[in-house]
């Protein structure tokens, strides 16, 4: 089972991405678990638990800490997430 995180500050996009990913994965007969986060700060608060995810989708334009900076911080924690 794939573990996926979606990090976007806009609820509409988080929900839409989750639906699209779920539909795609179901079409490939692949089980997945999808968690959603409202900010890079919320996601980064997981610290080492971030490594539970196989894939993380990040919004580039977010308040406080953007997707690029969030990705840099994730890489400091783990290099095993795409």
Go through the PLM ranges and name each one.
Residues 11-35:
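Two-component/phosphorelay signaling modules centered on CheY-like receiver
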Residues 1-3:
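Non-catalytic signal-transmission and effector/linker regions of two-component phosphorelay proteins
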Residues 39, 66-69:
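Acidic catalytic/metal-coordinating carboxylates
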Residues 8:
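Conserved acidic carboxylate
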Residues 18, 36-55:
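Acidic, metal-coordinating helix/loop segments flanking the phosphotransfer/catalytic sites
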Residues 48-51, 73-80:
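Conserved phosphotransfer cores of two-component systems
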Residues 60-62:
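Receiver (REC) domain active-site loop signature in two-component systems and cognate sites
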């Amino acid at each position: 089972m794939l573990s996926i995180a979606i990090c976007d500050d806009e609820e509409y996009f988080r929900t839409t991405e989750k639906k699209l990913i779920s539909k795609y994965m179901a079409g490939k007969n692949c089980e997945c678990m999808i968690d959603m986060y409202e900010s890079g700060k919320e996601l980064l608060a997981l610290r080492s638990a971030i490594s539970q995810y196989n894939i993380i989708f990040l919004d580039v334009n977010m308040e406080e800490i953007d997707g690029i900076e969030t990705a840099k911080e994730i890489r400091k924690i783990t290099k095993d997430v795409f």
